[in-house]
Amino acid sequence: MELQGLNDFIFWRYDSNGNVITDSDKGGVTYDGNKGKVFDPKTKEEFKGLFKVDLESSKGATQANLTGLAESVQRVYGSNYVAEITTGTAQPQAALAANDIPHAVSDTLIGLVKDELGGYARKGQAKPTQGGLIIHSYNPWNSIDFYFAFPMGIYVPGELNLQTNAENPTVVHDAMTLNAQARGTDQLLYEKFYSNEPGFDYGKMIKFITGQSAVDATADNKKATDTQGQPLSDH
């Protein structure tokens, strides 16, 4: 299916028990009003602890480059022919970028710890930051919203290269990478969602990927809905 552009992406952090961190004093995200908050389009329920990187909250998401989706292949030869083929485990990565994520959000996501001096520090033996990610794109020809979801992974910071020249300063944007891993409860590595599928429901997708529901409940609703929670047949 053709996809055009990057609408937004949503990220969050987990605590040591695998629960989404909702308390900003314990490593959760902070908000400026409703900017960055994620809501269920049907019930208007807020999904606490999640942050949406979009035009309003971060001057726009600019990149979600996915690599490592394919399994590695190893060929075993015998008698001058390929006798056996084995496949390894996929090792996905999502390289993310945005124009202006609030620093309190991006620094916390990559594991920096705020101190009383107004700084965000990383010590020599930093603990990995576990979190998840949902990337949102769109197919305009069939009006399909597409979501690529990673329920679990480790966030690491991107590089920072500050420069200037004789005329203009060089603009540097936010960058980070999610190294995906399978979720322990169900071994889910990643999942694709399509808004035109009969079982799709935005709110249930969020709850399933973030671990707020123990099973995939998206199949309970057999009527496809758009991102506003309205049945497609009503359009």
Report residues per predicted region.
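Polar/acidic, low-complexity leader/linker segments enriched in S/T/G and N/D
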Residues: 1-59, 230-235
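Core alpha/beta structural scaffold of self-assembling particle/tube/pore-forming proteins
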Residues: 3, 43, 102-129, 196, ...
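Extracellular structured ligand-interaction cores
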Residues: 6, 91-93, 130-132, 145-147, ...
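N-terminal, charged/glycine-rich beta-strand/loop interface patches
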Residues: 56-84, 88-93
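Exposed beta-sheet edge/beta-hairpin loop segments within beta-rich domains
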Residues: 85-88, 122-125, 162-172
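Short helix-loop boundary/capping segments
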Residues: 110-117, 121-163
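Mixed-charge, glycine-accented linear interaction segment located at domain edges/termini
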Residues: 153-235
